[in-house]
């Protein structure tokens, strides 16, 4: 595979709907052989996953990576807890931010960069129902304005 940034292999689209993402951090992810092969095929899912700081390390939970078809007995557990690779200062910063009420770590994207699998995680705060409705109204208003401008010209 050529060096450089590759395509996004998995994306958590629901995160931007359910959370206000305040900051993003790129982290490496510790994987087994059959897991990386399965991810390169595009069979990873971030939908219900979340990250947490535990005993000075960051782990991602409920990230589903489908078993590799040719892996037979060497296959992995699809919902295994996986360690994220971050520097100590980054971990301490994330720990401080998530101790505040209402903040959590949400996996946003999974991609290949320079041959290594990386995950973009976000420090996020949950949206209330009225925030979601307000965002939907603003999106609809922008769409209407764009339609009107398109018809005008």
UniProtKB/Swiss-Prot annotation:
InterPro entries per the UniProt record, alphabetical: SmpB, SsrA-bd_prot, SsrA-bd_prot_CS
SUPFAM superfamilies: Small protein B (SmpB)
MF term (GO), any: RNA binding
Role this protein plays: Required for rescue of stalled ribosomes mediated by trans-translation. Binds to transfer-messenger RNA (tmRNA), required for stable association of tmRNA with ribosomes. tmRNA and SmpB together mimic tRNA shape, replacing the anticodon stem-loop with SmpB. tmRNA is encoded by the ssrA gene; the 2 termini fold to resemble tRNA(Ala) and it encodes a 'tag peptide', a short internal open reading frame. During trans-translation Ala-aminoacylated tmRNA acts like a tRNA, entering the A-site of stalled ribosomes, displacing the stalled mRNA.
Family: Belongs to the SmpB family.
Name of the protein: SsrA-binding protein
Subcellular location field: Cytoplasm
Cellular component annotations (GO), alphabetically ordered: cytosol
Gene name as annotated: smpB
Keywords: Cytoplasm, RNA-binding
């Amino acid at each position: 595979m050529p060096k450089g940034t590759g395509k996004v292999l998995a994306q958590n689209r629901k995160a931007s709907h359910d959370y206000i993402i305040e900051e993003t951090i790129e982290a490496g992810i510790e994987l087994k052989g059959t897991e990386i092969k399965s991810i390169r095929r595009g069979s990873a899912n971030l939908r219900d996953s979340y990250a947490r700081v535990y005993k000075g390390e960051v782990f991602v939970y409920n990230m589903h990576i489908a078993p590799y078809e040719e892996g037979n007995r060497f296959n992995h557990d699809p919902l295994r807890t996986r360690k994220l690779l971050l520097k100590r200062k980054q971990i301490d910063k994330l720990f401080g931010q998530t101790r505040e009420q209402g903040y959590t770590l949400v996996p946003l994207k999974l991609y290949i960069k320079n041959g290594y699998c990386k995950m973009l995680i976000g420090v996020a705060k949950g949206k209330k129902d009225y925030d979601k409705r307000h965002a939907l109204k603003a999106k609809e208003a922008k769409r209407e304005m764009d339609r009107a401008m398109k018809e005008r010209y």
